[in-house]
C-alpha cells in the first residue's frame, strides 16, 4: 500500500482509541530484572522489607522507565504478524513527548495501555509519522501510572 493511501486511511482514525491492551502483572521479579539490567537498585524498587516499612507506597514500586518501556509490548507494536496499521512494513520508535508518571506502579499491580491516535503526518514518499497519546492505567486506580505521546 502506498504511503499516501496509508496516511489517508490512518487520518480517518484521528481522535479514536486505537488500542486497549490486556492487563499485565508487574511483579517483583520483573522489577528486579529491570533493576539488574539498568543498574538502578534504589531500595524503593528492590528492598521489599524496607519499602514495606519506610516507603509512602507500602511496597516496592516499578521504575518509571520500566513502566514506560512496557508501551511497545502492551500496545501490540512488536507483533510482526499483526502490524499496528495494516499495510505497514516497518515501524520505528522515533521518540516520546510530554512523558509524566502521575502514579507509581506498586509490585503486584496490573497495568494496561490505552492509546488514542492524535497525529499523522507524511514525511516523504516512503514514510510517515504517527503520534499516539498513550495512557498506562493501573487496575483499580483512578490516576494513571504514565501518560506520554509516542511518536
Model-derived features: positions:
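HotDog/MaoC-like acyl-thioester-processing domains
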Residues: 1-15, 101-151
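A beta-strand/beta-hairpin structural motif
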Residues: 94-98
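Hot-dog-fold acyl-thioester-processing enzymes
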Residues: 2-93
